[in-house]
C-alpha cells in the first residue's frame, strides 16, 4: 500500500468508529530510561529479536500488524531497515515537510488518536491483526498508561545505563504481570522480558475481598488478545501441561490408599518470583490455608488442632482417631501428627514425645541455620533444610512428601529448589507451589534479599484416578494473571509473622473444583 496521510477531514469521518486498542513494546532501565541522544544506549541482539518476533508474527497469515512510532523514531531506524518489513508502519508527525512519498507499507498520522481512528476503520480494521506502539519518548509518555493500552511488553534492563529520555512508570494499580522471563546477561547487561496486562480500566475501579485476597474479577478469555508467543509463557501452563501429560501418558500404579494413580517420575517446574506470585488461577487455591499451614510449620507445631481452630482442615484426615489407629499409632492422642515437617525444621534429631511437650533448645534448628548461612555465608552449597528423618518416619502420621529444600543466593536474589518425593497433582501440588514460594519470599525478606526462582522437582508425580475428571474440568480453564504478594516491611524475624502480614492483590481465580483427598 502506498503512503497515506490522515488529515482532519478524515478524522472527522472516522470519529464514530471505535478506536483500536494497542500494546506497547519498549525496553527500559529501572529508572524507565529508554534512550540517549536519540538512540538506544545498549546493544542487545536478543531484545531486537524479541521486538521483531512480537511485532511481526500474526496468528492469521493473511493479516499483518501495525507499528506506531514518532517521526524521530522512524528516522533513527537505519535506512536499510525502514520501513520495518512485514508490518504497516504508522509514523506520527505534524511536519508538512515530512516526505515519504511512494514508500510501501507506511502511513502518516498527526497523533496517537488519529492513528487509532485510522486503524479502526476499513481497510485497516480488516487487514491489521494487532497494533503496537513502539516509541519514541513523547509517544510512549502519552500512550503507556492510557485505557486503550491492553498490554505492555517491557524489556527490563536491570543494569544502570546512562539515559536522557524517560517514560512514566507502569501503573501497577491497573496492570499485572502476565509473564516474566528469567534474567539473562548480554554484553554486560542483565535483563528480562516482562509482559503486563491491563486488568482494570482505571485505578479507581473497585475490587472485592475474596479468599483473603483482593479480587478484580476478570475473565480468562480476556487475555487471548496477547500474541501466542507471550500468552503461552504464562507459568501456570507448566502445571497444566504436566497434568495433561500424566493423564494421557502416565503409568498406571497402585498406592497405599487403594485409590490407584496415573504417575510419571522425575518432573520439574520453575517459577519466577520476581514480579508475581504463583498461586494457580485455573481453580481457586485456599490462600489462607497456605499461609496458616506454613506459619504452623515455622512454629514447629505438630498439633493439627491448632489449624482446626483457625478453620484449616487440611490435616484432619491424617489426624483422626480412625486414621492413627489404622497405622498403628493407637497410643497417640487424636490431632497429634508426630514429628512431621515443623518438628524436623526446628528440632531435627530431638526425641519426640507428644504434641504438648516443650522442645525449646532440643535438636537442631535447621530454619535458623538456613537463615544464618544465607546472611553470613551466601555462597555455601549446604544451605539445606530436610524434613526426611528416617529414624522418625515410623512416628509420623504421614512421612513428608515435600522433603528437601536447598537455597541459593546470587545477584542479590534468593532462590529455592525443593524436592517432593510424592506429588498429588490435583490437591497437593498447587498448595506446595504456593507454600514454598511463600517460604522463599519470607526468607528473602528477613535476609534483605529479593525473591528469585522457585524450582519444584517432583519424584512420583501422580493423578489419583478419582481426580481425573475434576482435573479435566480444570484443564478447560484459561489462566489469569498471577497475583502480586507483598510482605509487611516492619517484620524482619522469621518467628514474628502472622497471616495478616501477607498482602495478596489481584487474585481472581476460576471457581473451586472439588477433589476428595485420598487418605
Curated annotation (Swiss-Prot):
Annotated DHFR domain residues: 21-198
Domain of life: Eukaryota
Keywords: Acetylation, Methyltransferase, Multifunctional enzyme, NADP, Nucleotide biosynthesis, One-carbon metabolism, Oxidoreductase, Transferase
Coiled coil: none
Catalytic activity, EC: 1.5.1.3, 2.1.1.45
Active site per the UniProt annotation: 401
Region (Thymidylate synthase): 235-519
GO CC term (a single one): cytoplasm
Matches recorded under Gene3D superfamilies: Dihydrofolate Reductase, subunit A, Thymidylate synthase/dCMP hydroxymethylase domain
Residues at which dUMP binds: 256, 402, 420-424, 432, 462-464
Binding-site residues, NADP(+): 27, 33-39, 71-73, 92-95, 135-142
GO molecular function: dihydrofolate reductase activity; thymidylate synthase activity
Binding site for substrate: 25, 47, 134, 155
Alphabetical list of HAMAP family matching this protein: Thymidy_synth_bact
Family: In the N-terminal section; belongs to the dihydrofolate reductase family.
Subunit architecture: Heterodimer or homodimer.
Protein name in UniProt: Bifunctional dihydrofolate reductase-thymidylate synthase 1
Organism: Arabidopsis thaliana (Mouse-ear cress)
High-level lineage: Eukaryota, Viridiplantae, Streptophyta, Embryophyta, Tracheophyta
Name of the gene this protein is made from: THY-1
